[in-house]
Amino acid sequence: MGRYIVPALLCVAGMGFAHAQSALQPIAEVNLFRREPVTLGQIKARISAIEKEMGKKLSTAERRQFMDSLIDEKLFAQAAEKAGIQVTDAEVNQYFNGMLSQQIGRAVTEAEFANYVKEKQNISLDQFMKQQNGMTMAEYKKFLKTQVSTQRYVAQKKADEFRNLKGPEDSQIRSYYELNKQAFFRPDTVKLFLISVPKGSGPAAAKAKAQEFVKKLKSSGVKATADIKSKANGAQAGYSAGEIYLGKTAVTATQLGLTMEALLEIFGMGVGAVSDVNETANDYQCFIVLKKEEAKILTLSDLVEPDKTVSLYEFIKNLLTSQIQQKALEDAIREVSAELRKSGTYKVFLADAELGKVLDW
């Protein structure tokens, strides 16, 4: 049998070489000021990531569009580099942290989000990113860096157009409100002053501390909250305290890890009422009810969030302004892309029919 081993190994090695050769095959080339290939491996990696995120297989025509976007991405990256536009790793991390924060609705660092993912799903942040969009964290940050540099390059090229953008008119703001009025429903809300005492290594002491807070709140009421809150900022305080708003919704109950019945009990308490000590997996909590508001559809003059300063009118104005700016940016990117492609700065090596076959995997 020995005489068959070497040919078999050569066959396996040849298959591996063919695969590598296929992945490294240049499908196109970008050359604004530096020759840079667009390989089949890069195209497959990007399209696989997009298909994973979209949850479906793309058609050959759609894959061609995303291949073209990869060419544009490399053109923009070279154009930004040539123009001296730089994006630091610190800036990329800031954008990345902002995106992570949006996912869980509060400000978090990369390390905090990694702990959150580990706790909830028992996977690493790298694995989480791979599941979400098919890219590792390093790959996604590189992609994000290119996106930021592209936006800055386009903003520089189209500075005059962006400066002359007009915001939404009053009639547009009011029309948007009328058409979307039901979306501005605010459920019954309750404002609590909440105290959390982490169990740490001494759960008995933590519970005793929470019970002391309950006594203090029942004795002095709202007057006690200022002192409790100010002392919570100390490094050795051993607890946190502050105001929170809760909406009477199933989403709120889920976010807090409460049953709907438990949430309704909170809403059944009157203003000034103090809770007993409640135990969770990580801490002991207690609270006093500060304020209650009935459900309503917000008017344009209402505040979007209680205790904040932004009215619904300003909120809609800002929203429409962002939409105008986003559309202007997308239009500008298309225009600059067309300008970059005019000068023979890229080349696709395969004819349409052959390219269609390559993209049909």
From Swiss-Prot:
Organism: Treponema pallidum (strain Nichols)
Protein's UniProt name: Basic membrane protein
Localization annotation: Cell membrane
Top-level lineage group: Bacteria
Gene that this polypeptide is encoded by: tpn39b
Signal peptide positions on this chain: 1-20
Main location per the UniProt record: membrane
Gene Ontology molecular function: any one: peptidyl-prolyl cis-trans isomerase activity
Keyword flag Signal: yes
UniProt keyword terms in alphabetical order: Cell membrane, Membrane, Signal
Keyword Signal appears in the UniProt entry: yes
PANTHER family for this protein: PEPTIDYL-PROLYL CIS-TRANS ISOMERASE HP_0175-RELATED (PTHR47245:SF2), PEPTIDYLPROLYL ISOMERASE (PTHR47245)
Entry GO terms, CC: plasma membrane
InterPro entries named in the record: PPIase_dom_sf, PPIase_PpiC, PrsA_foldase, Trigger_fact/SurA_dom_sf
Pfam families xrefs: Rotamase_2, SurA_N_3
